[in-house]
């Protein structure tokens, strides 16, 4: 086969003396690409990718490269590429002159005077504006700050601010330890907010709130009220005004265990001698006993009522189905447990006589 026409060599249009006289025509040696220019081309291509590779190795247009980040990093890369395109083939390739250019037709520098281009006339202003925008973006980035001061042992609500404000301040959030009896161990160095007025206002609101859950909720209300009183005392607000429901009920903890951790600060009475009226004033013991007598009688009557109801419910059971003895015994046990409910009389099975007229194809044996 004849391979003479397989390769067609195109001579340099500028002639053999164009490379030798390029510096003289350009006026200075700046027309030739330097090592810095090659390095910038390498970085702009992403470490050897992009325009430095053949078209078959480049990713498809719809697919993002693995190393390319989105957001602000992607914007910087696109602007850098725009600057690189502005200087595309504006300098002559020294490696092509030496015969060692690895980029061949994908090189960003001119491989001859016919490929040489001129940059835009205002290229210096464009480059300066790009550098200023890059510096301003770096200044507005939030630095990662580490705190060298002590930390509050595992508590996210309080943190030490050591190192002269080296830690990030969270003055918009309230300190959790500041509202406890012990107080915040960091004091003014704490990075969270210490609000004296809100502390006093919160303690008064807790003490004036009504009790929750009736008699069973005395313990929890007692704890909240005592904590509010101690917090108010720690804040230096002086003696707090007693609420209208002060010691109007017996303390559950004191009545069950004989001990209350709050002592004299408890909002509930420790015995009949400490009982107060609603709004203030001690309760008269004689009138309290007289008022308690009807309650005891009512309790005796209410205790007798379930027993009578249970007896009435058990009398209905013998009229139930006598053919199911096991079910009858079980029903009697359930009826004994449900003493407070009214037992329905259990109706006896009517047999097929009552349902023989439901279906049209039923054969009535009586006919």
Curated annotation (Swiss-Prot):
UniProt feature, compositional bias: Gly residues: 67-76
MF terms (GO), sorted A to Z: DNA binding; mRNA binding; zinc ion binding
Transmembrane feature ranges: none
Zinc-finger ranges (C3H1-type): 87-114, 169-197, 245-273
InterPro entries named among the record's database cross-references: ZFP36-like, Znf-CCCH_4, Znf_CCCH, Znf_CCCH_sf
Keywords of this entry: DNA-binding, Metal-binding, Repeat, Zinc, Zinc-finger
Keyword set includes Zinc: yes
Protease keyword on record: no
Ranges for region Disordered: 38-80
Protein's UniProt name: Zinc finger CCCH domain-containing protein 56
Taxonomic path: Eukaryota, Viridiplantae, Streptophyta, Embryophyta, Tracheophyta
